[in-house]
Amino acid sequence: MKAYKLLTTASIGALMLGMSTAAYSDNWRYAHEEYEGDVQDVFAQAFKGYVEDNSDHTVQVYRFGELGESDDIMEQTQNGILQFVNQSPGFTGSLIPSAQIFFIPYLMPTDMDTVLEFFDESKAINEMFPKLYAEHGLELLKMYPEGEMVVTADEPITSPEDFDNKKIRTMTNPLLAETYKAFGATPTPLPWGEVYGGLQTGIIDGQENPIFWIESGGLYEVSPNLTFTSHGWFTTAMMANQDFYEGLSEEDQQLVQDAADAAYDHTIEHIKGLSEESLEKIKAASDEVTVTRLNDEQIQAFKERAPQVEEKFIEMTGEQGQELLDQFKADLKAVQSESEG
């Protein structure tokens, strides 16, 4: 851990040295929360490629751990050390409480086409969220889904009772903790870098993540029982330091917007079929893995506990959260009506 901290400090020092000669130069810095080849990295590389193909600017991409944990890269973006950051609302929720809306269980549909249409058309996503991020010096460029959340644990989960006395790792997100309390578990916040070891040593009994992240992080090796609960999607957001963005020329602002749009389209194509592909890799790599998909009756037992989480969300966020939730539900209803029609 000490060596990791030293490496992180050295990395940040190198960034600061580069900035001392040309703040906000045409070498833009972009950090995200995942490993090489994971969804956020796919987005970042597509963004980088578009920018470099259509301008003289360059983009340096930093992956998980190179500049610290999620909280670190957000702080560096707000301070102007980084120009761009990709961070899940799971971590942003401590900064922007209303962003925790994605952690209300069973709010989102499970059908991918409906989810993608929602992200494209939602007023809450495309009009309300940018204003919330702007209050914290952040220019929200894109929100996008990465995949359905899957629970892994030391034994199969089929009911809320199976969560009794289970220590489930959560991000540093108050509403996610409330979700697992409602499900009957003991939420246990833990930095991502400590999750594998925590599962291996029994400090925690389980965790949740999209299946591709479970595969790439090797979590199935130490937490082999996978449960598809249908309770939510892992959502993330790509944003810029607002001072940096507003200081760009109109041409460069358009370049950034176009690059984000192109990266979004590329990433959405990438995630189609990714869950199935990742699950097949996991099954091929381990004979100990079990896969449980809850049926409608089992899902209903969890759904019945969701309203108390929604109430907590309103307690945490007040009138602003209520307005966002109302719009969120209206947007979802509109999209679902279109798909049914």
Swiss-Prot record:
Chain sites annotated for binding L-ectoine: E34, R169, N209, W213, F234
GO biological process: transmembrane transport
Claim: Signal is one of the keywords in the record: yes
Keywords on record: Periplasm, Signal, Transport
Subcellular location: Periplasm
Variant or mutagenesis effect after changing G273P: Conformationally unbiased. Has wild-type affinity for ectoine
Any Pfam family matching the protein: DctP
Keyword check for Signal: yes
Consequence of gene disruption: Deletion abolishes accumulation of ectoine from the medium.
Spans traversing the lipid bilayer: none
Organism superkingdom: Bacteria
One Gene Ontology CC term in the entry: periplasmic space
Signal peptide: 1-25
Primary site of residence: periplasm
Further facts: The ectoine/TeaA complex displays a closed conformation. Interaction with the transmembrane proteins induces opening of TeaA, which facilitates substrate release.
Protein role: Part of the tripartite ATP-independent periplasmic (TRAP) transport system TeaABC involved in the uptake of ectoine and hydroxyectoine in response to osmotic upshock. Probably functions as a recovery system for synthesized ectoine that leaks out of the cell. Binds ectoine with high affinity. Affinity for hydroxyectoine is approximately 20-fold lower.
Family annotation (NCBIfam families): TRAP_S1
Family the UniProt entry places it in: Belongs to the bacterial solute-binding protein 7 family.
Assembly and binders: Monomer. The complex comprises the extracytoplasmic solute receptor protein TeaA, and the two transmembrane proteins TeaB and TeaC.
Official protein name in the record: Ectoine-binding periplasmic protein TeaA
Organism: Halomonas elongata (strain ATCC 33173 / DSM 2581 / NBRC 15536 / NCIMB 2198 / 1H9)
Underlying gene: teaA
